[in-house]
Design a protein with these regions (language model features):
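S-adenosyl-L-methionine
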Residues: 33-74
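Conserved class I S-adenosyl-L-methionine
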Residues: 6-15
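Glycine/alanine-rich phosphate-binding loops at beta-alpha junctions
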Residues: 1-4
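Conserved SAM-binding loop of SAM-dependent methyltransferases across substrates and taxa
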Residues: 16-28
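Short His-Asn-centered micro-motif
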Residues: 12-13, 33, 60, 77, ...
Length: 232
């Protein structure tokens, strides 16, 4: 939000308000949208207590609110990963709301849209699906806690940006690379001879999920121990 005069954020999937309570600290204008009246009442009570009393609470459907929204600097969605029977879902199209049907409206009504998706999702396929018919995926963030991948975040925008960036976070450790170098090709990072006494490096969960092994090898000056190995 650096350089923006009056940035705003809209959380279309408010829930318990945890996400918006953190993001609202960075902006003067924030809106929380949630269908369940009970959760809205909880949000109205909690927001002033945690120093984000400026957050506007809207009790209603997030998708319907998007349709009548003018513009917001930033839109956030954490689509529900449950089907009508309560079963867990992973695919974007199976989550509610379905971002694939809203992506063009989201990017036309915001400078940036952040979508939180299942860490089980194939991010390569997600990029293909989200970019189908348009070019909107700008960043991918893979977030791990204690070496367990917890969140997969996609930054969408109609604002042109090359190349696509991937950010891998594990606790206090962070690594970034461009999509063009996020390949699992091992041809030029294989080390045929392993010297006794050298360190053995195993990438963390976010890096393994990203598959940016070539850029990792270049950045750390290491070689894979075998052609199809992810140990360095």
């Amino acid at each position: 939000f650096i350089g923006l005069s009056a940035p705003s954020i809209v959380d279309l999937t408010g829930g318990l308000g945890v996400d918006i309570s953190f993001m609202a600290q960075q902006v003067p204008y924030a809106t929380y949208v949630e269908r369940q009246e009970m959760l809205c009442d909880i949000a109205r009570h909690n927001f002033p207590l945690i120093q984000v009393g400026h957050v506007k609470v809207i009790c209603g459907d997030g998708e319907a609110y998007l349709h009548r929204l003018g513009f917001s600097t930033f839109i956030f969605l954490d689509p529900a990963r449950r089907d009508l029977h309560g079963g867990k879902t992973v695919a974007i199209a199976d989550c509610t709301p379905n971002v694939l049907t809203l992506k063009e409206e989201l990017t036309s009504k915001s400078l940036y849209t952040l979508v939180k998706l299942s860490p089980m999702l194939d991010w390569h396929q997600a990029v293909i699906d989200l970019n189908d018919g348009c070019d909107i995926v700008r960043e991918i963030h893979l977030v791990s806690v204690k070496n367990e991948c917890k969140e997969l975040l996609f930054v969408l925008s109609s604002k042109r940006q090359d190349p696509l960036k991937i950010y891998c976070v594990n606790d206090d450790s962070a690594f970034s690379c461009a999509l063009s170098s996020a390949s699992d090709g091992q041809s030029h990072i294989f080390q045929e001879t392993i010297n006794p006494g050298d360190y053995l490096y195993e990438p963390n969960a976010s890096l393994m999920k990203a598959g940016c092994f070539e850029q990792l090898a270049v950045s750390f000056g290491v070689k894979a121990i075998a052609v199809n190995s992810h140990l360095f």
